[in-house]
A protein has these predicted regions:
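Non-catalytic, structured segments within soluble enzyme domains
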Residues: 1-65, 74-91, 271
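Active-site SXXK
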Residues: 59, 155-156, 183-210, 240
Length: 272
């Protein structure tokens, strides 16, 4: 009988890596996608991984322990709907349509799974016509989400991986811990692109004074801070990092040049 239990996130990543290696002529055999798939699943391979089951078990337990998160668990919705009308025409809808329907500015997050399903039914009712049939995919994930990868710093081997919080419903699903899932890095990017090169190559120190004041990009677009339309005056680079001051970061990047910042990001190994 066919095993319908979803693979773990670690096995998902391992599977993807093996297929990639089999198709890479410099690493594996230069197989086609079909050849690689057949070799993996039908070729009788013995596969040995770097996973440490004890570490993996700890990661699974900790990441899925609700007591490690805010008391009020919310649920994020990912949604896809295909409506087949009575005349055979099809219309496709996604999470974005539900956001518009509910006038939700930031994201589809609900206080309970039941609330999410109620909104879905209300949306479907708003577009329904006689004779419709529906094909939908509903994914609800507890929020906030999290992921973890444990690497042996001595060998570089991956010992454990969890790609998301909550019950895994399918194999090869979104893996937040794997390189295929990119995310906007936020203000931590200021350190890599701006302050690191300023400290390393431009003679700056953490005590360097940067003035938080009205400032514009070269095209005249004003730069704003996350805390609102006011300014905090002189602050050290250390304080600017602590406060995540946007204007200070832009002024520093302009001073060292974006080209230098870009070079440092490349040297740090960033490629996405």
């Amino acid at each position: 009988t066919q095993n319908t239990t979803p693979q773990s996130y670690f096995v998902d990543a391992l599977t993807e890596q093996i297929l990639t290696d089999l198709e890479d002529p410099d690493v594996g055999l230069g197989y086609s996608e079909t050849q690689a798939y057949n070799t993996l699943y039908k070729g009788g391979l013995s596969i040995y991984s770097t996973q440490d089951l004890e570490i993996q078990g700890i990661c699974d337990q900790v990441l899925n322990d609700d007591s490690n998160y805010p008391y009020k668990v919310q649920y994020g919705l990912s949604y896809a709907l295909t409506v087949t009308r009575a005349d055979g025409t099809q219309e496709n809808y996604s999470s974005g349509h539900i956001k518009q329907f509910r006038n939700m500015k930031y994201g589809l997050t609900f206080d309970s799974e039941e609330q999410a399903h109620q909104v879905i039914e209300s949306f479907k009712a708003s577009i329904a016509k006689e004779g419709d049939t529906y094909d939908e995919v509903i994914n609800l994930s507890p929020q906030p989400q999290a992921s973890v990868t444990v690497i042996d710093q001595a060998t570089g081997q991956i010992k454990a991986m969890v790609g998301g919080r909550g019950t895994k419903s399918s194999s090869m699903s979104l893996n937040r811990a794997y390189t295929g899932s990119t995310r906007q890095p936020g203000s931590c990017f200021k350190i890599l692109s701006t302050y690191a090169p300023a400290l390393d190559s431009a003679g700056e120190t953490l005590a360097t004074i940067i003035k938080d004041e009205p400032y514009e990009y070269a095209d005249g677009t004003p730069v704003s801070n996350w805390w609102g339309n006011y300014y905090r005056g002189n602050m050290t680079m250390r304080k600017a990092i602590e406060q995540s001051a946007n204007i200070c970061a832009v002024k520093t990047l302009t001073e060292i040049t974006p080209q230098l910042g870009f070079t440092y990001c490349q040297n740090f190994g960033l490629s996405t």
